[in-house]
Amino acid sequence: MLTLLVLVFTVGLLLYVKLRWHYSYWSRRGVAGERPVYFRGNMSGLGRDLHWTDINLRIYRKFRGVERYCGYFTFMTKSLFIMDLELIRDIMIRDFSSFADRGLFHNVRDDPLTGNLLFLDGPEWRWLRQNLTQVFTSGKMKFMFPNMVEVGEKLTQACRLQVGEIEAKDLCARFTTDVIGSCAFGLECNSLQDPESQFRRMGRSVTQEPLHSVLVQAFMFAQPELARKLRFRLFRPEVSEFFLDTVRQTLDYRRRENIHRNDLIQLLMELGEEGVKDALSFEQIAAQALVFFLAGFDTSSTTMSFCLYELALNPDVQERLRVEVLAVLKRNNQKLTYDSVQEMPYLDQVVAETLRKYPILPHLLRRSTKEYQIPNSNLILEPGSKIIIPVHSIHHDPELYPDPEKFDPSRFEPEEIKARHPFAYLPFGEGPRNCIGERFGKLQVKVGLVYLLRDFKFSRSEKTQIPLKFSSRNFLISTQEGVHLRMEGLERP
């Protein structure tokens, strides 16, 4: 019995010493930071009462005025939390070669759809990035634009059948699902007519019914190598099977009928043809199609719904934007064209301010690929060190954006932008690992808003949540209770 007690005590003591040494990593290097809790690090409350933005803001506000960076622990995983904008510029652009990786979870063996541009690193990411960039040129956007307009008309038709109390996130998600289905897959998803269409159900399953809790997701992305060894999956099997079958049927149909379209699937087909160097496998093609679909429909619909929310709470902004939209449409014979969208500067400001207040990602992740000395310091990062860039916290810094909770599109007038540090605004990231679909995402948001503001007026309802509370179950910034508004029809000019 005594031997057992001694053994338990010894093991406990060794564990304590090891944990204490591990969690003193940053303090031993002279880096300030919140005192971590054993096993939880700085994550206490995450997924229960707190969202990632709450934790990041707490740390940012505590250290921003006195430190350029601080130590940060996601459970057991150590990261450097960067607050200095010049240092962020160094990491994302000047010294990009030292921080080219994101270090995100992927498990191609058990979950092949995780082998996509968003999650991959190294040569695989570089090859995909170089080849997929051509999908998002301005020329390609002009080619896809008529598809967006067609879905925009269907959006207003669907809205006329449900004036009154609406849940804006679902409405916007049905719109963006149909846009992505048309522009990426050449398919009619019909989510606006049928909210329970298969594409809509699968998209909702990924975003609203994730396979794992936010705590498990945090573990997977904090310890991707361990999660991969434990054979974790990110997507539900039925979601993977649906997208694999959809892509397989689309490819087979186009090859059989010799159909050629200027869209994402066509480019992926060409990158998978025999004779192409490092040609994509079928699973790799499906993985890129999936991430484009998920990123395109969910992030854009979230931005659209947040924008409608702010317009409902700020009727003066809504009316000024509607006046601009109607004036541009009148000049163009009531037709919306790719060029006419560029004639709406206030629309651009409104969307930019929405992304400032509600960036989709609470923070950006980078991982060092080599030893790196932080400029103007003695701190040397080891290869594999993780970096956190707190986008949401930066966007809510009152020194950068006075009264940050106020929705104020004038922050994005040209002279205001010029007066700010260029890295004070990071909704799409920066540098070679910025969001490849930025142009497409903003364009479909603007098209949707133009059609909605042309025909409808939005205001708060009894169910409107003020202020909005973010869902603690999701890493992305999304609402807990939805975006409930009142929608009234307007007479067309």
UniProtKB/Swiss-Prot annotation:
Primary residence: endoplasmic reticulum
Any Pfam family hit: p450
Membrane topology designation: Peripheral membrane protein
Keywords attached to this entry: Endoplasmic reticulum, Heme, Iron, Membrane, Metal-binding, Microsome, Monooxygenase, Oxidoreductase
GO MF annotations, alphabetized: heme binding; iron ion binding; monooxygenase activity; oxidoreductase activity, acting on paired donors, with incorporation or reduction of molecular oxygen
Presence of the UniProt keyword Oxidoreductase in the record: yes
Localization in the cell: Endoplasmic reticulum membrane; Microsome membrane
E.C. number: 1.14.-.-
Binding site for heme: 435
Family: Belongs to the cytochrome P450 family.
Protein name per its UniProtKB record: Probable cytochrome P450 6a13
Organism of provenance: Drosophila melanogaster
